[in-house]
């Protein structure tokens, strides 16, 4: 009574809300959909967005969800596509049993504004079950004086499928005594009757065995069989008679196992064996056989399994009484299950938000549904929350309730509420269900983020790797929730010439600073910028701080060799007299370092030599000197690789390559040996080759000049003609050198060579091409061949 008064006292508080909510529910519709049973999980049912006339993405924006009446999630909604899908395989027989059509009811809930769409899903049957007889053999005792046309009712087969997939026909194996007749029952089911066509004669045949077949209407059809054994008896005049054709009784659903449901009674006026009556279930389903049992001698029916009103609220039981002579009679027992208050109310929360802003009155916090599986007064419910709370329960349709704030909340007075939702039924004794929820009151955004320091100084060594973490900034916010979530950003620099966006970046979530590229101390020694911290409140509040970045110098410059040049041009060859004394200064490697301090201190080291021990390099000045006397057995050509290393950490280095040629005096001309020349040629053979080569070059030069003049005089009109000449083969040609680097002269170009000599020097000088019309061959090839020539021999072409 107190609960009912409490409910009435709140009616006036929620009346205006109920009326307001009725406006939002006025557009709610009713949807009917269908799906075939046993379809795979995730099968498409319908596109709810199109069916409800909503734009794409609207379902997700409104927080749409699907709620079933029995709290089982048979369906799944993809709110992004709007597709309603099956969440599991649906078995119509398990869901609805023999009931047809099989309907599942559910609701579609939507927010902003809150709406409920009621819908139903029909599960269409498929022929996935074959008919099954409970008894594989049925025994009929028929007297031999039974009249033709007498019908004997047989137990029907069971088929969980419904409609056309259920049982549609019965047949009997061919015989001369019986045929099958199909009859209907009050429940709309068909059952077989065995009709006698010809009188039986016990003396001719005492027993017959027939096969009864049940056929369903599926495609393809399924069938089940049972054996009917007929025993022919002597004359039995009277069949048993029940005291009542219909027995009606009631049983509470909490009745214990073994509880006596009812006792049926039948009498037979015959005597002896023909008067002995036995009782049995007839045409009973498996559910009846597992729930009840019958005493075959007394006719008492007992409870074999506990009853459940919520599953089955009534039973129809067919009882057969048969005497010893095979005659039988039937009656029906109707058992009504009485409901007891054995199910507490259920509370199903569909949506819940545990946080509400302090300045948000009449805000929905939770949507839930209540249900009680009991019936009558046992299934009636009241729902309420504690007194003195700034919240209201607003009733809706289909037993839905919405928990909303009654007015604006004050976080400074109370930041958290523990609400108990109580649902009580009106049964005896009363059962109740409680559900506790916690609501947090969130603060408004009234505090700006504050940096831990007003300015930050960061140090980073130059040549850092890109994306290097160089430091962090941090800010805190006194608010809570999203108002306290800080986002960091780089503010535009005051120096417009500073490319800040390409220098550093900041992690928006944690304030970590990263160098976007490698910094160069020589280019940029320091820079500063400002960072901002902004919360996620509305409106957003922010603050800023100064960040200074100092770049530290590093040993990032390798030594650079000034002499000899190492720029890819032809190598420079130094001449060394064979008469040089030990310690003779051959040349000096000159190098510089762009760094400063100890990073620029250079040391020299001989890394590789054609003949180790012949030359040495001074460590501090790079001078290359002979280490011992030269002999005739020493190779004429030598290649030295000098390592130049600075004193940085880690040290950096460069190499210089020197080409040395041992000569017997500076007055003799020399020619750098091609790479293919033997490195171990004897000195005397080299001298002979040089003399022969010089003579050959002189002769060929003179012959070329004469040939050129002759061709010019004979063919004045052909300015682009090219002179030809033969060049003797050999490792050292005479006065002609092939600019392509081969041992014979190219067919495209010939050059005049002038060999000049002076004290201590000797060089080749190319005056001009013998063929003047170079344009006919193409400027590109000229440049390419000249470049190849210079790179191969290091000579200057004029």
From Swiss-Prot:
Q: Does the keyword Glycoprotein apply?
A: yes
Outline the extent of the Cadherin domain: 35-133, 138-242, 247-347, 352-451, 456-561, 568-671
Signal peptide location? 1-26
* Residue numbers on the Extracellular membrane side: 27-690
GO biological process, any: nervous system development
Q: Does the keyword Transcription apply?
A: no
Record-annotated membrane-spanning stretches? 691-711
Listed SUPFAM superfamilies: Cadherin-like (SSF49313)
Q: Which domain of life is it from?
A: Eukaryota
GO CC annotations on file: plasma membrane
| Name of this chain's protein | Protocadherin beta-10
- Native species: Pan troglodytes (Chimpanzee)
Q: Gene encoding this chain?
A: PCDHB10
């Amino acid at each position: 009574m107190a609960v009912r008064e409490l409910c009435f006292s709140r009616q006036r508080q929620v009346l205006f809300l109920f009326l307001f909510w009725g406006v939002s529910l006025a557009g709610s519709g009713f949807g009917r959909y269908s799906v075939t049973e046993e379809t795979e999980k995730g099968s498409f049912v319908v596109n709810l967005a199109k069916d409800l006339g909503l734009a794409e993405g609207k379902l997700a924006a409104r927080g749409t969800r699907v709620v079933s009446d029995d709290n089982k999630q048979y369906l799944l909604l993809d709110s992004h596509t709007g597709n309603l899908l099956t969440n599991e395989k649906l078995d119509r027989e398990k869901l609805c049993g023999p009931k047809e059509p099989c309907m599942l009811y559910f609701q579609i809930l939507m927010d902003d504004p809150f709406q409920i769409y009621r819908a139903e899903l029909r599960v269409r049957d498929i022929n996935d079950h074959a008919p099954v007889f409970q008894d594989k053999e049925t025994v009929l005792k028929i007297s031999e004086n039974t009249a033709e046309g007498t019908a004997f009712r047989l137990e029907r087969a069971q088929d969980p499928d419904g409609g056309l997939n259920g049982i549609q026909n019965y047949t009997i194996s061919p015989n001369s005594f019986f045929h099958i007749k199909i009859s209907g029952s009050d429940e709309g089911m068909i059952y077989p009757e065995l009709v006698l066509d010809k009188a039986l004669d016990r003396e001719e045949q005492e027993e017959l065995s027939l096969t009864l077949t049940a056929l369903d209407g599926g495609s393809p059809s399924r069938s089940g069989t049972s054996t009917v054994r007929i025993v022919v008896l002597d004359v039995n005049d009277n069949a048993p008679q029940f005291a009542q054709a219909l027995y009606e009784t009631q049983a509470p659903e909490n009745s214990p196992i073994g509880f006596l449901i009812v006792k049926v009674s039948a009498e037979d006026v015959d005597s002896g064996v023909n008067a002995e009556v036995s009782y049995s279930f007839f045409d009973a389903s498996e559910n009846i056989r597992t729930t009840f049992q019958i005493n075959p001698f007394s006719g008492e029916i007992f409870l074999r399994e506990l009853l459940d009103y919520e599953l089955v609220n009534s039973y129809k039981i067919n009882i057969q009484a048969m005497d010893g002579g095979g005659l039988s009679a039937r009656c029906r027992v109707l058992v009504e299950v009485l409901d007891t208050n054995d199910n507490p109310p259920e509370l199903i929360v569909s949506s819940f938000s545990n946080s509400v802003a302090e300045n948000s009155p009449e805000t929905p916090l939770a949507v839930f549904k209540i249900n009680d599986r009991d019936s009558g007064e046992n299934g009636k419910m009241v729902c309420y929350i504690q007194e003195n709370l700034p919240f209201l329960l607003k009733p809706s349709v289909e037993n839905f309730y919405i928990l909303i704030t009654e007015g604006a909340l004050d976080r400074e007075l109370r930041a958290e509420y523990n609400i108990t939702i109580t649902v009580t039924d009106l049964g005896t004794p009363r059962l109740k269900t409680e559900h506790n929820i916690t609501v947090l009151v969130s603060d408004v955004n009234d505090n700006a983020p504050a940096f831990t320091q007003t300015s930050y100084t960061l140090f980073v060594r130059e040549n850092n790797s890109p994306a290097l973490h160089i430091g962090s900034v941090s800010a805190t916010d006194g608010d809570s929730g999203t108002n306290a979530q800080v986002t960091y950003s780089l503010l535009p620099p005051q120096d417009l010439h500073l490319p800040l966006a390409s220098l550093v970046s900041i992690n928006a979530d944690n304030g970590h600073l990263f160098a976007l590229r490698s910094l160069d101390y020589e280019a940029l020694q320091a820079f500063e910028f400002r960072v901002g911290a902004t919360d996620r409140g509305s409106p957003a509040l922010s603050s800023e701080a100064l960040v200074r970045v100092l770049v530290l110098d590093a040993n990032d410059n390798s030594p650079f060799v000034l002499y000899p040049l190492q720029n890819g041009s032809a190598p420079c060859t130094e001449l060394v007299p064979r008469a040089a004394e030990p310690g003779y200064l051959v040349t000096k490697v000159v190098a510089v370092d762009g760094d400063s301090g100890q990073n620029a201190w250079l040391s020299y080291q001989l890394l590789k030599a054609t003949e180790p021990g012949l030359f040495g390099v001074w460590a501090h000045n790079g001078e290359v000197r002979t280490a011992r006397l030269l002999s005739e057995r020493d190779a004429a050509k030598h290649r030295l690789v000098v390592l130049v290393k600075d004193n940085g950490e880690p040290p950096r280095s460069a190499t210089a390559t020197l080409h040395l040629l041992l000569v017997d005096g500076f007055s003799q001309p020399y020619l750098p040996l091609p790479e293919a020349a033997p490195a171990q040629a004897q000195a005397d053979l080299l001298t002979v080759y040089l003399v022969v080569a010089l003579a050959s070059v002189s002769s060929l030069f003179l012959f070329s000049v004469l040939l050129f003049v002759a061709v010019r005089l004979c063919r004045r009109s052909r300015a682009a003609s090219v002179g030809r000449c033969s060049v003797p083969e050999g490792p050292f040609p005479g006065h002609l050198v092939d600019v392509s680097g081969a041992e014979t002269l190219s067919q495209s170009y010939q050059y005049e060579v002038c060999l000049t000599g002076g004290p201590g020097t000797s060089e080749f000088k190319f005056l001009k091409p013998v063929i003047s019309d170079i344009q006919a061959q193409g400027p590109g090839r000229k440049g390419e061949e000249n470049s190849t020539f210079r790179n191969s021999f290091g000579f200057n072409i004029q």
